[in-house]
Amino acid sequence: MAKILKQPDLSDPQLKEKLKKGMGHNYYGEPAWPNDLLYIFPVVIMGTISLVIGLAVLDPAMIGEPSNPFATPLEILPEWYLYPVFQILRTVPSKLLGVLIQTTIPLGLMLIPFIENVNKFQNPFRRPIATSVFLFSVVFTLWLGIGATLPIDKSLTLGLF
């Protein structure tokens, strides 16, 4: 019968040096199956579920206002993740132009690897084009998302100017 537990080779000088420095484990050979998967994981999962249910029972907060089926809201807004798209379609004078702007976004994203192909670095500080495109996109998307929640006359300037 083969050994299930892996025993360390304590005659190995590299292992001895690591253990002297505090690297490595003080114990060896405890398998993940069945100890972790059958005993620890269910306890963590049940603890997480009971914590979420307990917090939901102790503080039953409402998710927004109750809806009134007989009253139409003044302005119908999409879900939060569609605010930037809604803002572009709302502020562009031609709807065809708004749709064309929406199609240029994925096309521009597909061009980034080809533009940045000359730079082989993975560090974002050494990839100025990709970093600047990413930062501009994040700021512009947040600007559009915040502007979508404001009235249309303040939406482009966010009421700041």
Curated annotation (Swiss-Prot):
Among SUPFAM superfamilies, the record links this protein to: a domain/subunit of cytochrome bc1 complex (Ubiquinol-cytochrome c reductase)
What keywords appear on the UniProt entry? Electron transport, Membrane, Photosynthesis, Thylakoid, Transmembrane, Transmembrane helix, Transport
* Domain of life (superkingdom): Bacteria
Q: Where are the transmembrane segments?
A: 37-57, 96-116, 132-152
Q: What topology does it adopt in the membrane?
A: Multi-pass membrane protein
Q: What is the role of the protein in this entry?
A: Component of the cytochrome b6-f complex, which mediates electron transfer between photosystem II (PSII) and photosystem I (PSI), cyclic electron flow around PSI, and state transitions.
The name under which this protein is listed is Cytochrome b6-f complex subunit 4
Identify the gene encoding this protein.
Answer: petD
